[in-house]
């Protein structure tokens, strides 16, 4: 098909008409060249060899002007390929402020030095990547048949894509960040700060997004440490022997000041808290209530700290790290208050002008028996989440049962949208989600296949299989490249718990193999592809052409079959 389009362009450039006779000539010439390729080459032919065969065929047919034009076309393409793989050319584009390079990512402010450094490194990495990739993959990427994502990072480095870092193992068991060994935090505030520090380092060690999975449930233990501290303080504030009425007035005063401390504004104050234990004396009950009020404020401040630190961080790639926080399933008091604080902080906004926070992306989970129906214990928090979404765009809402049905187990998406499949650790026999990752993405340009098929479905399926094989090679290369990382390349990931706790000389593949890690195959243009065969109106208001729908589904099914 590329041969046909190139020769067709050459004919048009020498002012020859493009009628049925010319179409037949082009088709015959392409078939002749394809036949020679099959005879001469056991595997894929090099681009230069194909171009030579086309030139010779044109000359043999006495199409000298067309041959000359095709030669010029070939030279232009050769120059484009050479430039794409030339590091010096990449640097020159950066120096000359090529807008396609400078403005390629709207999330990055290209006026900032850190971003400029990353853009330069990315340009060099892309040029180097095209020399590192298998030739068939590099050629397909440059032609647009497939897209090898994130070439400004991989394969020049052995970095992986998105992940669910195991923040919770790191907080519980300690870790080292830079030159500082970190002990397990003793408060929700320190836990929140440590998480944002980990996030910053993870973002500098991979190129995809990251998610704090089930954050409310995991952070609850650190909020409980605050409660225990505040309970001890309350025992000093409300000592034994104090009149109960006097103690109650202290608690009521603290509760009265709570809405202002939590920036409630016109929001209805929370009802008076109840003690955890009703089988203790009245003074101890008042102490527990006072400790709860103070703990709620500590949780609110910690979640505010996390929100501000994530949005003020700028990592090695010149942008704010892409962070997602998944929450919504915790039902104990501490997890509920963490959920509330996350949502209240997002509703309030950042700074004196109350700007909507960009990060973290919030993902709230709805589950039957937890927060779905009015009688569920967390229904009030679901209502707050929906209020937050109407005012601040986030949180996104996911449904627990659907994710389990589709993926095999529950987890939040990694960064923006990719979900891990369910995976049971063969050593423990338990589901494992945290500490897992994706190694990269390759997408197939499906509309191009449809256009190149010229309405011939048999040819479409043949070309789809061929492009899928190229995508498969590209994904295998991604896996191979990630395996070349060593634990010392990314200590936070490989040595201190985000992905695992390996020795300095261990093989990182033990964290990838047996389906612990994933790779992703993407596609674009399913609707447009179907329109090539069934017309642009195959999708109509409130419906679609049944045959068109079945064809679109058959494409995805075929891709799924090949992946399996």
Regions found by a protein language model. Give the residues of each.
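Charged, amphipathic alpha-helical regulatory modules used
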Residues: 1-97
């Amino acid at each position: 098909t590329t041969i046909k389009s190139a020769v067709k362009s050459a004919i048009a450039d020498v002012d020859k008409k493009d009628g049925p006779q010319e179409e037949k000539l082009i088709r015959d010439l392409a078939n002749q060249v394809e036949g020679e390729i099959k005879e001469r080459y056991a595997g894929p032919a090099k681009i230069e060899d194909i171009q030579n065969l086309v030139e010779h065929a044109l000359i043999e047919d006495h199409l000298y002007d067309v041959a000359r034009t095709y030669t010029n076309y070939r030279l232009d393409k050769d120059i484009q390929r050479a430039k794409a793989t030339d590091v010096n050319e990449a640097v020159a584009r950066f120096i000359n402020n090529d807008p396609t390079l400078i403005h390629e990512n709207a999330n990055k402010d290209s006026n900032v030095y850190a971003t400029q450094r990353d853009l330069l490194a990315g340009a060099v990495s892309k040029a180097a990547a095209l020399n590192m990739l298998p030739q068939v993959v590099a050629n397909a990427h440059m032609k647009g048949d497939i897209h090898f994502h994130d070439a400004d990072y991989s394969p020049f480095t052995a970095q992986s894509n998105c992940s669910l870092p195991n923040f919770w193992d790191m907080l519980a068991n300690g870790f080292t960040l830079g030159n500082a060994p970190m002990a397990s935090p003793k408060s929700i505030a320190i836990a929140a700060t440590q998480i944002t520090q980990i996030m910053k380092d993870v973002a500098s060690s991979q190129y995809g997004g990251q998610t704090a999975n089930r954050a409310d449930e995991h952070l609850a233990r650190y909020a409980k440490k605050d409660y225990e501290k505040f309970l001890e303080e309350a025992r000093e504030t409300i000592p034994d022997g104090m009149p109960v009425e006097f103690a109650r007035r202290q608690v009521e005063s603290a509760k009265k000041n709570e809405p202002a401390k939590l920036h409630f504004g016109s929001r209805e104050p929370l009802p008076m808290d109840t003690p955890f234990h009703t089988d203790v004396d009245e003074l101890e009950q008042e102490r527990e209530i006072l400790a709860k009020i103070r703990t709620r404020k500590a949780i609110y401040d910690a979640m505010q700290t996390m929100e501000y630190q994530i949005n003020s961080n700028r990592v090695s790639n010149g942008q704010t790290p892409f962070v997602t926080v998944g929450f919504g399933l915790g039902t104990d008091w501490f997890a509920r208050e963490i959920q509330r604080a996350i949502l209240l902080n997002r509703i309030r906004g950042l700074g004196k002008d109350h700007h909507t926070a960009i990060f973290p992306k919030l993902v709230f989970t709805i589950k039957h028996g937890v927060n779905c129906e009015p009688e569920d214990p967390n229904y009030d928090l679901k209502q707050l989440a929906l209020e937050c979404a109407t005012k601040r765009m986030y949180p996104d809402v996911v449904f627990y049962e659907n994710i389990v049905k589709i993926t095999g187990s529950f987890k939040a998406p990694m960064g923006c949208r990719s979900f891990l499949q369910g995976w049971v650790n063969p050593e423990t026999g338990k589901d494992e989600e945290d500490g897992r990752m994706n190694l990269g993405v390759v997408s197939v340009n499906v509309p191009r296949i449809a256009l190149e098929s010229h309405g011939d479905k048999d040819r479409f399926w043949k070309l789809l299989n061929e492009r899928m094989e190229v995508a498969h090679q590209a994904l295998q290369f991604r896996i191979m490249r990630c395996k070349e990382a060593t634990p010392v390349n990314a200590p936070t990931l490989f040595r201190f718990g985000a992905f695992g706790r390996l020795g300095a000389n261990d093989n990182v593949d033990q964290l990838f193999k047996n389906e612990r890690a994933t790779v992703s195959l993407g596609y674009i243009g399913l609707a447009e592809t179907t329109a090539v065969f069934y017309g642009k109106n195959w999708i109509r208001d409130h419906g679609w052409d049944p045959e068109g729908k079945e064809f679109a589904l058959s494409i995805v099914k075929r891709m799924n079959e090949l992946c399996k």
